[in-house]
Design a protein with these regions (language model features):
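Cytochrome P450 core scaffold surrounding the K-helix E-X-X-R motif
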Residues: 44-47
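Catalytic tyrosine of NAD(P)H-dependent dehydrogenase/reductases that use a Tyr as the general acid/base
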Residues: 53
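Alpha-helical scaffold within the catalytic cores of cyclic-nucleotide enzymes
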Residues: 1-33, 37, 58-71, 81, ...
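Cytosolic regulatory/linker segments at or just downstream of nucleotide-handling modules
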Residues: 40-42, 63, 70-132, 136-175
Length: 175
């Protein structure tokens, strides 16, 4: 739970800093965060006289790819389903199944949306579930309703667009 809270707090602090820049300071890019769970090797990998403290491993790679995927998915924080299962949060919204750059195995991803009501989050979850189940009637009903509600929400509209381009069991491939 603390890792997800820290990821969201880091994103929010970065965005506040970016938005509150003093006049005359060049604009900064959007803050993005990826969160995954797994084993990692952490330590000093530098030589004598050169400290290079880092973390290595597949979980670190996946978190890095999730961070990069935010740009394409029009989100700020992406959390893998594995990390979300441990997060203990009720504000996470499924953003579908994606194949991350350089990865063969698709990942189900979620994003925090505390700005949405539980009903809105449940509607988005129903859309993703209908697509995953191959229930075209339920999917079209959900997509139509969500388009009316979230027509100006870039991440939700892009989710619908991605799901429209994939079939049951497929993932959206991020390049």
């Amino acid at each position: 739970p603390r890792a997800a809270a820290a990821a969201i707090a880091m994103y929010e602090a970065g965005e506040k800093f970016r938005v509150d820049l003093a006049e005359g300071v060049p604009p900064l890019g959007m803050m993005r965060v990826g969160l995954h769970v797994g084993d990692a090797i952490v330590g000093n990998f530098g030589g004598e006289g050169r400290i290079q403290y880092t973390a290595l491993g597949d979980s670190m790679n996946t978190a890095s790819r999730l961070e990069a995927a935010n740009k394409g998915l029009k989100t700020g924080v992406l959390i893998s389903a594995e990390a979300a299962a441990r997060a203990g949060r009720d504000d996470l919204v499924p953003m579908g199944r994606v194949t991350l750059r350089g990865r063969a195995q698709p990942v189900d991803v979620l994003t925090p949306r505390a700005d949405l009501s539980p009903e809105q989050r449940n509607s988005i979850a129903a859309l993703v579930a209908a697509h995953a189940a191959g229930d075209k009637n339920a999917y079209v009903t959900c997509a139509t309703a969500l388009t009316q509600i979230f027509g100006q929400d870039a991440s939700i509209m892009f989710l619908i667009e991605r799901l429209n381009e994939t079939e049951k069991g497929e993932s959206y491939v991020l390049s």
